[in-house]
């Protein structure tokens, strides 16, 4: 196992499977409730949420999901898909990325994002988009540090903003 600049173990990233569903749902809820405090209502870990994640991660290609493991535990996940935006069907989309809050700032999100972008490129997309909350500053800093730029897209009465990433460079 390699280590990052803070001497933290780097995660192992692998394709997500149905056995990961409950951990993906837990990470989703934990990261939502920690990251979106004051921005969105808290979420609860429910059977319905686990079932939703099982449906999402078993959708066939071109939807893809990966998980990150560190210290023998699932600590994050990421998914890609064709863009749901009607602006351009040739766009890829970063569907969701989440890391367990206890593992933030350890490079796990960057590692997951690198895998997602690599596969979007390999799938032939020249650009990708993502949506995030307009006032989610921590997430926006993360995306901007990775080369994403606001492109002016808004939805949900301005509560969400769209970022775009050029995959050609």
Which residues make up each language-model segment?
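Conserved beta-strand-loop-alpha-helix junction that forms the acyl-donor binding cleft
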Residues: 130-139, 156-159
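Active-site acidic-Proline motif in GNAT/NAT acetyltransferases
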Residues: 100-102, 106, 134-135
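Acetyl-CoA-dependent GNAT
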Residues: 3, 11, 15-21, 25-102, ...
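Conserved GNAT acetyl-CoA-binding A-motif
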Residues: 120-132
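Conserved acetyl-CoA-binding loop of GNAT-fold acetyltransferases
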Residues: 144-153
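Structural motif
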Residues: 27, 123, 145-146
């Amino acid at each position: 196992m390699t280590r990052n600049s803070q001497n933290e173990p780097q995660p192992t990233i692998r394709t997500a499977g149905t056995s990961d569903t409950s951990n993906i749902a837990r990470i989703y809820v934990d990261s939502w409730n920690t990251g979106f405090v004051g921005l969105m209502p808290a979420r609860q870990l429910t059977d319905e949420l686990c079932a939703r994640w099982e449906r999402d991660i078993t959708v066939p290609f071109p939807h893809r999901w990966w998980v990150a493991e560190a210290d023998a535990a699932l600590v994050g996940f990421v998914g890609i898909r064709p863009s749901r935006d009607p602006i351009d069907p040739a766009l890829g989309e970063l569907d969701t990325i989440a890391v367990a809050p206890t593992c933030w700032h350890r490079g796990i999100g960057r590692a997951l994002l690198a895998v997602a972008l690599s596969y979007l490129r390999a799938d032939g997309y020249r650009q990708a988009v993502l949506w995030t909350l307009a006032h989610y500053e921590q997430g926006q800093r993360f995306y901007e540090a990775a080369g994403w730029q606001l492109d002016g897209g808004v939805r949900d009465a301005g509560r969400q903003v769209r970022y775009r990433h050029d995959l050609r460079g």
